[in-house]
From Swiss-Prot:
GO terms for biological process: aerobic respiration; electron transport coupled proton transport. The lineage of its organism: Bacteria, Pseudomonadati, Pseudomonadota, Alphaproteobacteria, Hyphomicrobiales. This is NADH-quinone oxidoreductase subunit B. Binds 1 [4Fe-4S] cluster. It comes from Bradyrhizobium diazoefficiens (strain JCM 10833 / BCRC 13528 / IAM 13628 / NBRC 14792 / USDA 110). Transmembrane segments: none annotated. [4Fe-4S] cluster binds at residues 81-82, 146, 176. HAMAP family: NDH1_NuoB. SUPFAM superfamilies: HydA/Nqo6-like. It catalyses: a quinone + NADH + 5 H(+)(in) = a quinol + NAD(+) + 4 H(+)(out). PANTHER family: NADH DEHYDROGENASE, NADH DEHYDROGENASE [UBIQUINONE] IRON-SULFUR PROTEIN 7, MITOCHONDRIAL. It comes from the Bacteria.
């Protein structure tokens, strides 16, 4: 009498081939076939130290800036048409949350304020009040020509010629309106600035 094969999952035949590792996850580099960043010297050094000792030593400041850049909570201060591009950054095409840049509704829970649009004289006290409600360290991204320097309405009697007259600005994103890619690049520059500045200087 013949034994049944592997049909319907009964009596599975033992596998004699080699056990394969799972395929690498993440965005693959077409030239190497490995995940993007796999050949980064920083990660190679960390991995070698972890495999050697089981832990690695880092400065507290490096740890704090790493955590801070990976969990920036931003609030919108959309004043005009630039706010539409700011909303687009959160949509699936760009998905700024993959960089740890998540939106919040309250200034008390936010690290970053994005000023997008024309700032008028009547709105300036509200902008300053919201900025003062944010906990330290706080950062501001000025998005678009109107927020940067008045833009199209620069000579209007009712427009503030740049929101840097009201709050300190960390990153300026130019354009009228700037594209979502430009704002995304501004976010990456802000993360780079936080890493460079550290906690004590701020």
């Amino acid at each position: 009498m013949e034994e049944r094969g592997t049909g319907m999952g009964l009596n599975p035949a033992p596998s004699t081939g080699p056990v394969l590792a799972p395929a690498p996850k993440g965005i693959l580099d077409p030239s190497t076939g490995k995940p993007v960043g796999a050949n980064d010297p920083f990660f190679l050094e960390v991995n070698s130290e972890l495999s050697d000792k089981g832990f690695f030593v880092a400065a507290t400041d490096d740890l704090i800036t790493w955590a801070r850049t990976g969990s920036l909570m931003w609030m919108t201060f959309g004043l005009a048409c630039c706010a539409v591009e700011m909303m687009q950054v959160s949509m699936p095409r760009y998905d700024v949350e993959r960089f740890g840049f998540a939106p919040r509704a309250s200034p008390r829970q936010s690290d970053v304020m994005i000023v997008a649009g024309t700032l008028t004289n009547k709105m300036a006290p509200a902008l300053r009040k919201v900025y003062d409600q944010m906990p330290e360290p706080r950062y501001v991204i000025s998005m678009g020509s109107c927020a940067n320097g008045g833009g199209y309405y620069h000579y209007s009697y009712s427009v503030v010629r740049g929101c840097d007259r009201i709050v300190p600005i960390d990153i300026y994103v130019p354009g009228c309106p700037p594209t979502a890619e430009a704002l995304l690049y501004g976010v990456l520059l802000l993360q780079k600035k936080i890493r460079r500045t550290g906690t004590i200087e701020r």
